[in-house]
A protein has these predicted regions:
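Glycine-rich and small/hydrophobic secondary-structure elements
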Residues: 25, 82-133, 192-217, 238-242
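Gly/Pro-rich active-site capping loops and adjacent beta-alpha segments
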Residues: 50-54, 59, 112-201
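Alpha-helical support elements that line or immediately flank enzyme active sites
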Residues: 31-100, 196-224
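Short coil/turn connectors at secondary-structure junctions
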Residues: 28, 38-42, 64-68, 100-104, ...
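Single conserved hydrophobic/aromatic residue that forms the stacking wall/gate
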Residues: 1-8, 12, 243
C-alpha cells in the first residue's frame, strides 16, 4: 500500500461496498437430453450461453466420446451471464439419459432459478488515489474483498469477479504505479460468476468516485482533471504495468 507514497502530495481514499446482484432471465434454466437409440448419440438442448464449454465439461466429467454428444443452444431470451457457466443439472440430465436410454427433461421453476443461478457484484473495495499538487495521478492502491459464495463455478472459478474488479480499477487513466490485493471469501451463498460486465461496474464506480473526490479536494473541474490524466490516442497501445 506504500506504492508511490514517496511522491505523494495528497491521498484520496474511501471504502466502497457493492451489493450482491442476481440475474433473473424471463426464461428459467431448462435442459432436455434426447437419445438416438440406434446410434447411441445424445443431444442436449440447453438454455446456455456457452454450448461449447458445456460439451467440454460433459466429455471431461462423464467420459462420453466427443462424437457421441451434441450440445445445442436454441434461440432463447437474455441470460446476462447467469447462463454462461456449467450447472450440475446439465450433467445430470445427460448422465440419466445415457444410463436409462431415454430422453430426460429438467426445467427449473422461478424459485429454484433465483436460488441457484450464479450471482455477482458482492465486494468491499478499499482504494486510495495519490496525486500531486497539479492533479497528476501518481498511484492507485486497493484491497478487493469478494464474497464468492459456497463453491467455485466452472469454468471461470470463484475468483472471476474480484479479479476483474482489480483489473479494471485504473479505468482509462495514466496511473504508472498500481497495486491491488484480492481476497476471495467463501460463504453460504450461491456461487458468483459472470454477470453484466463482470467487475467493470464496480471498478468504474470506484475510480470515478475517487476522481470526483480528488477534483473537489484540489478545487479543479472534474472534467478537466479527467482530461489531464486520460490516456491519449497517440499513447496507444498503453501498457506500463508489471503483472505479478
Amino acid at each position: 500500500h506504500l506504492l508511490g507514497r514517496r511522491q505523494r502530495q495528497m491521498c484520496i481514499r474511501d471504502r466502497f461496498k457493492m451489493g450482491r446482484k442476481t440475474p433473473l432471465a424471463m426464461e428459467p434454466r431448462s435442459y432436455v437430453c434426447d437419445i438416438n437409440k440406434r446410434t447411441n448419440e445424445l443431444t442436449l438442448y440447453s438454455s446456455t450461453q456457452v454450448p461449447g464449454i458445456i460439451k467440454d465439461a460433459i466429455l471431461t466429467y462423464l467420459g462420453i466420446n466427443g462424437n457421441q454428444i451434441t450440445v445445442i443452444a436454441p434461440d432463447v431470451g437474455g441470460g446476462f451471464g447467469g447462463k454462461a457457466s456449467l450447472y450440475m443439472e446439465e450433467l445430470i440430465v445427460v448422465a440419466i439419459a445415457n444410463k436409462l436410454q431415454t430422453p430426460v427433461k429438467w426445467v427449473s421453476d422461478r424459485y429454484e432459478d433465483l436460488l441457484t443461478t450464479s450471482q455477482g457484484f458482492e465486494e468491499i473495495i478499499e482504494a486510495e488515489l495519490l496525486l500531486d499538487e497539479k492533479g497528476n495521478f501518481i498511484s492507485l492502491n486497493s484491497n478487493v474483498y469478494g464474497d464468492i459464495g459456497a463453491y467455485s463455478i466452472y469454468p471461470w472459478t470463484a475468483a472471476l469477479e474480484p479479479m476483474q474488479v482489480a483489473g479494471f480499477l485504473q479505468g482509462p487513466y495514466k496511473i504508472k504505479n498500481f497495486c491491488s490485493n484480492v481476497k476471495c471469501i467463501t460463504s453460504n451463498k450461491p456461487p458468483t460468476g459472470p454477470y453484466r460486465g463482470v467487475g467493470r461496474p464496480a471498478a468504474v464506480f470506484v475510480i470515478e468516485s475517487l476522481v470526483d473526490m480528488a477534483a473537489r479536494k484540489i478545487n479543479m473541474n472534474p472534467s478537466q482533471l479527467r482530461l489531464n490524466n486520460i490516456i491519449r490516442k497517440n499513447e496507444q497501445p498503453y501498457n506500463c504495468l508489471l503483472y505479478t
